[in-house]
Amino acid sequence: MTIAIERNIQRGLFDLVDDWLKRDRFVFIGWSGLLLFPCSYLALGAWFTGTTFVTSWYTHGLASSYLEGCNFLTAAVSSPANSMGHSLLFLWGPEAQGDFTRWCQIGGLWTFTALHGAFGLIGFCLRQFEIARLVGIRPYNAIAFSGPIAVFVSVFLIYPLGQASWFFAPSFGVAAIFRFILFLQGFHNWTLNPFHMMGVAGILGGALLCAIHGATVENTLFEDGEAANTFRAFTPTQSEETYSMVTANRFWSQIFGVAFSNKRWLHFFMLFVPVTGLWTSSIGIIGLALNLRAYDFVSQELRAAEDPEFETFYTKNLLLNEGIRAWMATQDQPHENFVFPEEVLPRGNAL
């Protein structure tokens, strides 16, 4: 008689940690969680701390916290002072020298929030990759989430890296984001940039596709239950379709003359449109970071000043951008002490 004895497989520390991280629990951790959870916790904690207690008086000449009387719309974690350049503003660095109060005053919370926020978003993307691999599905959710990551990184990190300092990045707040949008329009003519146009088409197109798709599915649900609505009739494990693709195809064929006949192509298109919009707008922001002026009237104004033969049309768009610059240059960058003589300020139709 032969007795087979199983050899003990030596399990190292990595295997033990891997088992613990991937254990079935209410909130999955995984290897991606080692990046996601600490970074997200620190980024959100820094944002709540900054909007509650920390002033922007020393960086922007503004009150920006609840403690100073701001509300949810006006509170923000403001970007560092222009004089800080592109320093990462470590608490132990030469600027703050370990002084937490000074670190908050010079804008250290902004770099802390931005960097931990970026790594938190990357961790969330990796989390979707990891769980997709474990449950055996495709990783298109993670690929789609690359769009928001591209926008965050390009706007909050790449754009200010191309400018003079972190000062020109958007601060983390509602009104602060709108200020940044005005800045992009006035100094870069952002709305006339084709990459912005593609981004708008992608986001609004994605919203339209989402609304059409949701309404069409609701319209073509099979009546397979006795309840007042069809929600209770659905079971997650049913083998039958929940709605009629054939009916939906006939409906839109009658309306548009063409319709999606393939669910895979339909849903890929719903993925492709908004994600492509996010990526193209991110590419446009990188162009602004490098001060590419192909769609910026400032370059035409400079050329017109140098070349008497060069003509530009003075449009409402030019008037808008000049007005934004005249207002924001002094208000937004008080440390520069800009003074504009009245004769150079735009005067609308009184020209």
UniProtKB/Swiss-Prot annotation:
Cellular location(s): Plastid, Chloroplast thylakoid membrane
EC numbers on record: 1.10.3.9
Main location: plastid
CDD domains noted in UniProt: Photosystem-II_D2
Binding site for a plastoquinone: H213, F260
Membrane topology: Multi-pass membrane protein
Complex and partners: PSII is composed of 1 copy each of membrane proteins PsbA, PsbB, PsbC, PsbD, PsbE, PsbF, PsbH, PsbI, PsbJ, PsbK, PsbL, PsbM, PsbT, PsbY, PsbZ, Psb30/Ycf12, at least 3 peripheral proteins of the oxygen-evolving complex and a large number of cofactors. It forms dimeric complexes.
UniProt-recorded name of the protein: Photosystem II D2 protein
Native source species: Galdieria sulphuraria
Gene name, Swiss-Prot/TrEMBL: psbD
